[in-house]
Amino acid sequence: MKTYMQTAEQKSEKWYLVDATNMPLGRLASQVASILRGKNKPEFTPNQLCGDHVIVINSDKVLLTGRKVEQKFYRYHTGYMGGLKEISYSTMLSEKSDLAVTVAVKGMLPKNSLGRKMLKYLRVYKDANHGHEAQKPELIELDGRR
């Protein structure tokens, strides 16, 4: 069986709106990453950009289960000796909650140039205000069992 190849005329991009209120971070990120990849479409092609745009609102109300709020750290290195920096999740949530969701989704996308293009289709906002009413985003309910 041959791999389906999507042409430019067949490409259709939709906009989805996701409310992150009281959703576990991992469940939210995995389902958003699936939409960004286009896995929810019948014309999914793994080597093409066929996903949809996703707007995540209320990122400051996302949940972590267990004791991860105190124990989870985001680490990065500046490139200089002794330049390991770490930020706790509680600090990240209070200061940059949109970045916490973006990092979680980024980790679930492919680690190549196609994954970087998919990440540009993601918009994350701390509150319910977003400037994408002109795109007429469709509100979808994700499975956020807890």
Describe the function of each predicted region.
Residues 106:
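Acidic, metal-associated active-site segment
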Residues 127:
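Short, well-ordered beta-to-alpha junction loops that form the rim of enzyme active sites
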Residues 1-103, 113, 121, 131-146:
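Ribosome large-subunit tunnel/peptidyl-transferase-proximal elements
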